[in-house]
UniProtKB/Swiss-Prot annotation:
PANTHER family: RIBOSOMAL PROTEIN L7AE FAMILY MEMBER (PTHR23105). Transmembrane segments: none annotated. GO terms for cellular component: large ribosomal subunit. GO terms for molecular function: RNA binding; structural constituent of ribosome. This is Large ribosomal subunit protein uL1. InterPro entries: eL8/uL1-like (IPR050257), Ribosomal_uL1 (IPR002143), Ribosomal_uL1-like (IPR023674), Ribosomal_uL1/biogenesis (IPR028364), Ribosomal_uL1_CS (IPR023673). One of its GO terms (biological process) is translation. The keyword Endoplasmic reticulum does not apply. CDD domains: Ribosomal_L1 (cd00403). It comes from Chlamydomonas reinhardtii. The gene is RPL10A. Belongs to the universal ribosomal protein uL1 family. Gene3D superfamilies: 3.30.190.20. The keyword Ribonucleoprotein applies.
Length: 213
């Protein structure tokens, strides 16, 4: 059962979108869900991690990368960056170059034949960044859409986190839908559900945080 008031969410999203319109930016502002937790000890309690597919793409310009020759050709046809094994070999496990690669993309996809070689080719860099490639196990275009729609919640050492769940170019209804999907999934990951939620805010990239819970 959600504890978010529909009226509060509607007013908050409207205020966020209006705020973004009054000061248009040269880039598409994302809408971040900011979460504060309570009654959780990251040292003792299990650190949760989970991904959920949202109904609408939160970041249309999200950068995804894919690999192997066949998939590289498919990727090029749908406007997705791609690199083959030979390109990865050129990085020569250089930590700085692998880190730069991880920072340049939101997510990575790889063919089975390539995934097996990644630890040997790149070392642990992508894994440390939480961006180890997902295997391409169906139509690449579908997988790219799934990846662009998916968000991940992961508790680390502190009881707060922020996740991009929408962008200001979406309709207010789409933004609200994505926010509620994200919140309901997050609550399902928590040990005591809503009892672990201290506060929730939404914020556009350049806007002020707006409390919704």
């Amino acid at each position: 059962m959600s504890k978010i008031s529909n009226d509060v969410l509607r007013e908050s999203v409207s205020a966020l979108v209006e705020g973004a319109k009054t000061k248009p930016r040269k880039f598409q502002e994302t809408v971040e869900l900011q979460i504060g937790l309570k009654n959780y000890d990251p040292q003792k309690d299990k650190r949760f991690s989970g991904s959920v597919r949202l109904p609408f793409v939160p970041r249309p310009r999200m950068r995804v990368r894919a690999g192997d020759v066949k998939h590289c050709e498919q990727a090029g046809a749908i406007g997705v960056d791609a690199k083959g094994v030979e390109d990865l070999k050129k990085l020569n496990k250089n930590k700085k170059l692998v880190k730069k690669l991880a920072q340049a993309y939101h997510a990575f996809l790889a063919s089975d034949s390539v995934i097996k070689q990644i630890p040997r080719l790149l070392g642990p860099g992508l894994n440390k960044a939480g961006k180890f490639p997902a295997p391409i196990n169906k139509n690449l275009e579908e997988m790219v859409l799934d990846t662009k729609c998916s968000i991940k919640f992961q508790l680390k050492k502190v009881l707060c986190m922020g996740v991009a769940v929408a962008n200001v170019g979406m309709t207010e209804g789409e933004i609200r839908t994505n926010i509620m999907y994200a919140i309901n999934f997050l609550v399902s990951l928590l040990k005591k559900n809503w009892q672990n939620v201290r506060c929730l805010y939404i914020k556009s990239t350049m806007g002020k945080p707006i409390r919704i819970y």
